[in-house]
């Protein structure tokens, strides 16, 4: 007999709930615990599989305790129709879940609980907050579907948050969403999908998949305003056959209209914030609390002449004007920072001009020599020549680019397909 004991707990505003499950041969043989709503939940889950228990509703504390207990232990035999659906608590993932069910699949909702800064000003609007986890669970249970929460707070802090802080300490401008989506988040979700026997992972991202040059590649979503292919660009193409992006052929308003039409409670939920772990704060305030305190240093022109003072080099990125506080006859921009001397070097916009960009680490997913290169999430793509290098690639831009920052992602497109991606390591 295969026996296993699962334990979970949750606390909020002085209330505590805990639950202990005895699992034998894949079913819950016994359940006990204490706290608001726990007794009823224990009664309801006895005799169920752990996956079946994930579809049982309970109060917030009791539900959180159950989710923690079963989160890493959910397992099932492969089912031809089963899919895992990444749930954020928002309208996009809710509609993706609905689409999966309407297509005849057997969806299992999964939410990653990730670390957010407890000192942040608006932690409830982020995609991985306790409120978002609860909203995701309620969406699944309202449709009679199982939902599992994976608590990855410590792993996320180690894999995403700490590199974000250390990148700024080196004078870079890192994009944590690229690191999160390109490796951490999808690795965890795909691993969960394998555990529950899911054939596909479904997400609410606005992106598509396309056959291009004989290979399945990521492609832009049809709505340019919502396209998220830049954030997903570092996904290994070998994983793409296991993914489904049902919203890639539509825009946000179509998604909200669909949610309203089918009565999803998430239809009017506000959009979650980027860089979720900031919990609503400006990144500078976050960095100040997590290892990069205010420290005065000089603002210099290109000849080394002192023009003013600043409160930390890491508060500036190439192309930035706001916060310089330097009076001059012509507009001045941050050109680069010097971490060792805590200096910020400023100059005219012309000094920001770049025509060559090196990416490392980086990859070309198919052989190409001409691309459209997107060097920041909100910037338009620029035509360029590309040459493969040992650990990445080098771009020669047709037109001058301004404010190119080390640490950002260079994402390469041919037509709408993502044909390469890497982290910017040098500019000339």
Question: Predicted regions span which residues?
Answer:
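Active-site- and interface-proximal helix/loop "cap" or "latch" segments in soluble metabolic
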Residues: 14, 18-76
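Conserved active-site and cofactor/substrate-binding residues in soluble primary-metabolism enzymes
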Residues: 14-16, 36, 61, 65, ...
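Short amphipathic alpha-helical face segments that pack within enzyme cores
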Residues: 40-43, 95, 188, 405
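Phosphate/pyrophosphate-recognition segments in soluble nucleotide-handling domains
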Residues: 1-7, 60-91
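AMP-forming adenylation/ATP pyrophosphatase catalytic core
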Residues: 88-91, 202-209, 214-428
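Short, charged/polar N-terminal "headpieces" of proteins
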Residues: 1-20
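ATP-dependent adenylation/nucleotidyltransferase module used to activate substrates
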Residues: 77-233, 253-254, 260
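Catalytic cores of large soluble enzymes that bind and process phosphate-bearing ligands
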Residues: 58-65, 88, 128, 152, ...
